[in-house]
Amino acid sequence: SVGFKAGVKDYKLTYYTPDYQTLDTDILAAFRVTPQPGVPPEEAGAAVAAESSTGTWTTVWTDGLTSLDRYKGRCYHIEPVAGEENQYIVYVAYPLDLFEEGSVTNMFTSIVGNVFGFKALRALRLEDLRIPPAYIKTFQGPPHGIQVERDKLNKYGRPLLGCTIKPKLGLSAKNYGRAVYECLRGGLDFTKDDENVNSQPFMRWRDRFLFCAEAIFKAQAETGEIKGHYLNATAGTCEEMIKRAVFARELGVPIVMHDYLTGGFTANTSLAHYCRDNGLLLHIHRAMHAVIDRQKNHGMHFRVLAKALRMSGGDHIHAGTVVGKLEGERDITLGFVDLLRDDYLEKDRSRGIYFNQFWVSMPGVLPVASGGIHVWHMPALTEIFGDDSVLQFGGGTLGHPWGNAPGAVANRVALEACVQARNEGYDLARDGNDIIRETCQ
């Protein structure tokens, strides 16, 4: 006789456990599941739990050599999505033992690495994760965080101002440095390499770093303020990336930059550790995020990528602008902005927050509002994002008809006016345009 009956097994027999009581140490996931026609939601949810943890399509002999009850993922709750046909929110609990300590790479490889191509599912989206404090404590997190950054820069009580240098490609290193100097001298706190500025034939990284450092120190001497330029250290290998970060540190600049999705979480975590050890701030760009998060029923919501970045490490991350979007999108965006900044966040489905999240004092990340914004958006941005943010105007600075420095002056004056008006009790949503007009006189 044989020990078990071979053949295809229903996942729900093992992995659908609606009576399961989640543990404080479990990683919890909320998936938006669209099953194939004829596949019950319980089977689809159990399949997700199985294929992202211990399961395969049949019973295997080696199942008897371990404790599946200890290590398996469990689909513990399913709810239909209101207003959507054949879509369900499936909740899965994963035992903490399944994950390597301090590795976002391993966490994602387990939870989303294989299951998204599963035949029983028409579409699958990871909406949110609850990361338990026991796992968070295995990560360094951001190199410095919001308060330490403010102390390093000696800038308090207002959002920070930035500018992406344009045109993003084609400038020589010296002309690039000139634009950096003009913007910083005009009143900005930071300027920025674009995400695809690495080390191309028209401007090699070392030349850019040297001219930008010169611009930073000249602007600091003239304004009496601490300035920075996000020097993009992203490279083709981790070794080259660290080499660029080392050179930035040797120049004495305050901040470097990384494209964390195209560069990868392993590289990003290595760079974040280097930055903390060597006193560098780390700006994070989310290039490639829309490939993952744009579809509403498949992929991964950006709030998951934002949580992962806080664990992997970064002091700033691009987070959208909200301005001009629908109210619902505003609430969703502010939901993950607060996930980046706050120490504890309550579950709030209206803001897209599926679980309570406690960060056990891990430093926060400054959200960066960037993309298509200009001086007339300043009142709304100041009101929506508050002081702990970076407002980044590329064309909104360099597009000023009088030049780069006047563009920077306009942004700084508008920001100072909006902050002062807010502190004096004005309603920025109602009076914002009048405040900007009066400031322009």
Swiss-Prot record:
Q: Which GO terms describe its cellular component?
A: chloroplast
Pfam families membership: RuBisCO_large, RuBisCO_large_N
**Modified-residue entries (N6-carboxylysine), positions:** 192
Tell me which residues bind Mg(2+).
192, 194-195
List-wise, which residues carry N6,N6,N6-trimethyllysine? Answer: 5
**Which compartments is it annotated to reside in?**
Plastid, Chloroplast
Q: What is the required cofactor set for this protein?
A: Mg(2+)
Site residues, Transition state stabilizer: 325
Give the molecular function GO annotations: magnesium ion binding; monooxygenase activity; ribulose-bisphosphate carboxylase activity
Query: What EC number(s) would the UniProt record show?
Result: 4.1.1.39
Q: Which GO terms describe its biological process?
A: photorespiration; reductive pentose-phosphate cycle
Q: Which UniProt keywords apply?
A: Calvin cycle, Carbon dioxide fixation, Chloroplast, Disulfide bond, Lyase, Magnesium, Metal-binding, Methylation, Monooxygenase, Oxidoreductase, Photorespiration, Photosynthesis, Plastid
Classification via NCBIfam families: PRK04208.1
Oligomer status and interactors: Heterohexadecamer of 8 large chains and 8 small chains; disulfide-linked. The disulfide link is formed within the large subunit homodimers.
Q: Which family does it belong to?
A: Belongs to the RuBisCO large chain family. Type I subfamily.
Instruction: From the Swiss-Prot or TrEMBL record, give the protein name.
Output: Ribulose bisphosphate carboxylase large chain
Gene name linked to the record: rbcL
